Structure formats: C-alpha cells, structure tokens
C-alpha cells in the first residue's frame, strides 16, 4: 500500500503516532494534518501531497527541500470537495461546521506541527460556473470575470476559510496553517483520462472525468482557448487577491496563516494532465516549492 494511502486511514495514523511516541521520536518527526481537494488526493497520478509525503528518489541530491526526520501525515482530503458549504451536497464542504468539529477532535488530541490546506478550486467550476454564466453571451474575459465577482462567491469562500482558520487558530494558536494557490490551467476543455494505471478496475466503469470549465465558457466567452485561459487566470488571481491574501494579512490570526503562491510555474500544455490537474511531473515540480515553504514553518528540531 502506498505511504500516502496508508496514512489517510485514521486508525493507521493513530497507531503510527503512538509508535513514534513510544520510541521518543515525536520530538524529531513533523506531524501534519492535511485537508483538501483533488490537488491533494487525485488518483490520476502522484499528486501535490503525495510528492510531499513520498519524495522521489534523488530529490535530496538535486537540492529539493526534504524533511530532516521524515514526517507523519493525517490525511482526510477528498477529490471534488468544496471549501464553502454546498446546498446540494452539504457533506462535501471541507469548511462546514460538522467537518471542522470532527477535525478539531483530532487536532486537539495529537500534537500537530502544521495544517496543510488545498481548498477553493472546486467552488468556482462545474455546475456552479454553469449557473453563474447562464444567460450571458459574447463576453470577453474581463466581462466574464466581473460576472463571477458579482455573485459574491469570493466572499462566500473567504468566509468559509475564515471559519476554519479561526477554529483551528483558537484551538492551538501556535500551529501554522499553510494553503496554496492554484496554477494557471492550460488545457481548457480537456477531460481527465482514467485508466487501469490510476484507478484500477473502477476505470472500466468510467473512462473520463470532467471537463469542469470548458463546456461552461465556450458558448459564453468569445475568443477561443486564449480567451478562456485569460478568464481562468483572472479567477485564480481573484482567489489569491480576494481570499488568500486578505486572510494572510488578518492580524487576528497572529500571522499563523500563510499560502504558497504556485501561479505561473507550469507554463506548458505537456505539464497538465487535464484542464484542472497537472501531470505527475507537474505536481512534483510544485511540491518542491510547497515543501520548501512548509519546512520553514516547522520547529527547528523537525526540519
């Protein structure tokens, strides 16, 4: 069983944590709580979090940041989850009160060194995006982005983030919380191809997943793929400027919330598996950036 899969099981985490405690190794081993969406959980390939949990052979020799003493990861991420509560699927919201309360039970029971988040991308695509742009036509990217802004979606997502951050910061004020931006997609309209290599026999029932953006913009935004890329770029910049950055600057969080800006890293179509997910190599590149920032947040004895 892959390390990342094993550590996603709560019982496995508990057993491994207690084992490290019995061996007096917790003072050297960073312990992370991870909640997120498909950038932390997609089975299409090694994802962003997989590469942080299980670095590639040779990474250290190439100068990729490493945890000095390894790490223990409590993983509860799920592909498709939203940040803000959803009326149609309340159980798929990471920052809903029930989920926050559940995770707080673990967060206060074990000595975590950091919280890692991947949240917000799904809140702006798929059926929501279709509804937001319904009735619009012949828009340019700037006009389409203003439609998104007018829905109040950024405020909803920021409020959901804030609810999670305040709950966790109140519970343990000294624990850093690290999120990330998304990179700018290239292959707008491309579905995720599923196969035996990434999904096993489940792929026999479903050959692809998505696309989540292309079908919702192709009849609304004029200009083809270049215009669609420009629109999505504006949405991702808006996520940083209207959600992540204001929360980072919120003094009531004591400077304990931060995010890794991953924008502008993967600039080639070949670095993307589909319109929302990088390839395994793309995620590996982004993970090196994320891991370096995470190490900076850890206690000196655990870096």
Task: Give the label of every model feature segment.
Residues 1-30:
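Short N-terminal or domain-adjacent regulatory/targeting segments
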Residues 31-33, 39-150:
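Conserved SGNH/GDSL esterase-like catalytic core that processes O-acyl groups on lipids
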Residues 35-36, 180:
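Short hydrophobic segments within beta-strands
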Residues 120, 179-185, 261-264:
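Short, well-ordered beta-to-alpha junction loops that form the rim of enzyme active sites
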Residues 138-159, 164, 223-232:
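Surface-exposed cleft-lining segments at the edges of enzyme active sites
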Residues 153-205:
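Hydrophobic, aromatic-enriched interface-forming segments
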Residues 188-256:
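Substrate-gating cap/lid alpha-helix
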Residues 270-303:
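Histidine-centered active-site loop/cap adjacent to the catalytic His
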